[in-house]
Amino acid sequence: MNRRQFTLATALCAALPMASFGQEAKLLTLEEISEYLNGISAVESSFTQVNWDNSISTGTLLLKRPGRIRLEYDEPDSGLMMAIGGNLAVFDKKSNVPPERYPVRRTPLWLLLQRNVDLTDQKMVVGHGMAGGFTFVEAMDPKRPEYGSIRLNFTSDPVSLTSWLIMDAHGGETFVDLGPLKEAEINNENFNIERMVQQLVPEENR
């Protein structure tokens, strides 16, 4: 293990929640995970992120399925990521330049945001098992490895998404550890990319 790998592993262990003692964790089936994800309507949570360079960021997650997600980072970070209608935009709120844009289908987050999740019928699933008391499922597009992969981690009692790890095609890893997911009334304006462009980007730079 090289120094970078050791540092990343240490950061992941610090961020990763431990399964509660006294509760016997069980392996969730792909059917159970699919049912859980399809049951998510609108939730919010705090999060802690371990970035590819081992720096730590915090922020707030808004998730409104299908298709909508917003991750807004706390200061001093200036990042904002939002997706709606199949489009994902990544803003640097201090840059005064337009966001980077990607089709959601070309990102690992598609697994989480698609309308009907059926992991039993997904050729994208490349891993499923237990680690550290959590059930994990790992997915990637075998025809498009350059899109990267995502590993979702779940508790079993109650069933809940606790974290994810995104790995890009170059070996970079980004780990997101979620706080408790809370049901919420979330206005769709929170995912309005064009409105955010108008707010953050001077007209001459759009």
Where are the language model's segments positioned?
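Bacterial N-terminal signal peptides
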Residues: T10-P17
